[in-house]
A protein has these predicted regions:
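12-transmembrane solute porter fold
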Residues: 2-8, 14-17, 27, 220-388
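Hydrophobic residues within membrane-embedded alpha-helical segments of Major Facilitator Superfamily
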Residues: 20-24, 30, 46, 53, ...
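Hydrophobic transmembrane architecture of multi-pass small-molecule transporters
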Residues: 369-422
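Hydrophobic transmembrane-helix bundles of small-molecule transporters
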Residues: 121-236
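Helix-loop-helix hairpins in multi-pass membrane proteins, especially solute transporters
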Residues: 9-164
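Small-residue (Gly/Pro/Ala) motifs that create kinks and tight helix-helix packing interfaces
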Residues: 108-120, 181, 284, 374-379, ...
């Protein structure tokens, strides 16, 4: 993300799309064929970088041709408004434009999730990559036919390899933190040596990254971005949002364990979130244009998340119905749309354009890495503790004299013995 401005101002959309789609085709083929977890992780890192670049390139192209707006001028340092009226006008434009952009991408993301779940359910997980390879070939063909060719206007490429080193250190830090938070419960936290080593690596890599960025003349990441109050508040809001949103896992836990639904049915249930995104997007645009203050919109978003959780609290019961599970999904996604689209608008008020790339990096790091991992670790540990508590509570007076428990235990033991387990 800190490469955002330097990449998009190249203005060679056709070259970047062809190169990006071709590389993603190669990485998808490797993911479909390999059995190495290391290669899968490495290809995922490269594909994440390419997806972000291609998304931004295509977004700026779409804004130009669909909205007849030169988006590059809106992020070029030095082009900031010089008056309060100009900043107010820009804030109103962002309040209306960003919900529409987020609605577009979030609906596409949900469609992609549903499609991948269907492919994995009907066939095998490798077919997800084969399908993606076919789409990439189609994208390459469309790019060849529709996009004009632009010559490179400068001799020097805007990104040097030193900055890729900084980016690698940053990725190592996030990867180590993610490993600790994801596998900590499975490996019994710091009783496992890999968790200890990952923690040490995260601290060392994070320290090196902060030292390099604070001493370089042209840093990869602008640490001064945290001097802005709106950025700090945006960081906090996104952190709270994604930690609270991690409670959505309880819907899948309830439908999977209580209703015995498979992954495809759970993904189908998630399609109702598109209705919530649509409701939230339209409401956000309308209320923003009407000039409703941010504090009321944020309060409405968090209130909807709370209502979704409250619905689940009263709905989790033996007589719970699958058809009623769509309501917490719709309510939560409506609140998500409020907060997802307006937090960036609030955080970037009066923000100099030179900090835009660093803010996007901060936003995605919190929204897609740190907060979801912390939220998932928190809720899974709470869920495990509660499960152990209630299993112990209800099983303490059950023995082999209980006919149903005895039959279930005997069947499980025989099944394990047939599999060669002792």
């Amino acid at each position: 993300c800190p490469f955002l401005y330097r990449l998009v101002v190249i203005r060679r959309q056709k070259m970047m799309c062809l190169a990006g789609f071709s590389l993603m085709y190669i990485f998808s083929y490797i993911c479909a064929k390999t059995d190495s977890v290391f290669l899968l992780a490495l290809c995922s890192i490269f594909m994440g970088f390419l997806r972000m670049v291609l998304m931004m390139v295509n977004l700026f192209t779409l804004i130009k041709y669909a909205g007849h707006i030169e988006a590059y001028d809106k992020i070029t340092p030095g082009n900031e408004p010089t008056t309060d009226e100009g900043w107010d006008k820009l804030d109103i434009e962002r309040s209306a434009a960003q919900p529409a952009i987020y609605l577009f991408f979030m609906v596409l993301g949900q469609l992609g999730t549903s499609l991948t779940a269907w492919l994995a359910f009907e066939y095998e997980w490798q077919y997800i990559h084969y399908f993606m390879m076919g789409l990439l070939l189609l994208c390459i063909l469309i790019t060849f036919i529709t996009m004009p060719y632009h010559k490179y206007t400068t001799r020097r490429f805007p990104i040097n390899f030193k900055q890729f080193g900084n980016a690698s250190i940053f990725c190592i830090t996030l990867a180590c933190i993610t490993y600790v938070l994801t596998y900590g419960k499975v490996l019994d936290w710091y009783d496992d040596p890999t968790i200890r080593w990952a923690t040490v690596c995260a601290i060392i890599a994070g320290g090196i990254f902060l030292y390099i960025e604070s001493t370089q003349r042209n840093p990869y990441y602008q640490l001064d971005v945290f001097k802005l109050r709106t950025i700090r508040m945006g960081f906090l809001f996104y952190f709270l949002l994604m930690v609270l949103n991690s409670s959505a896992m309880f819907v899948n836990v309830f439908t999977g364990i209580g209703m015995k639904l498979d992954n495809f049915q759970n993904a189908t249930l998630g399609n109702w979130s598109m209705l919530g995104y649509l409701i939230g997007g339209i409401a956000t645009i309308w209320l923003s244009v009407k000039g409703v203050h941010f504090k009321y919109l944020f309060a409405a978003g968090f209130l909807l998340l709370g209502l979704s959780t409250m619905f689940m609290y009263f709905e989790v019961q033996g007589a719970g119905l699958y058809e009623r599970m769509k309501y917490p999904v719709i309510i939560r996604s409506t609140g998500m749309m409020f907060l997802y689209s307006l937090i960036p608008t609030y955080a970037t008020q009066r923000m100099p354009y030179k900090y835009l790339s660093s803010w996007i990096c901060t936003m995605l790091t919190v929204r897609m890495v740190l907060a979801p991992c912390i939220g998932a670790a928190l809720y899974t540990n709470v869920l495990q503790e509660r499960q152990q508590h209630y299993v112990t509570r209800y099983a303490q007076n059950v023995d082999m004299l209980h006919p149903e428990a005895s039959a279930s235990f005997t069947q499980t033991v025989q099944g394990m013995q047939y599999q060669g387990k002792s």
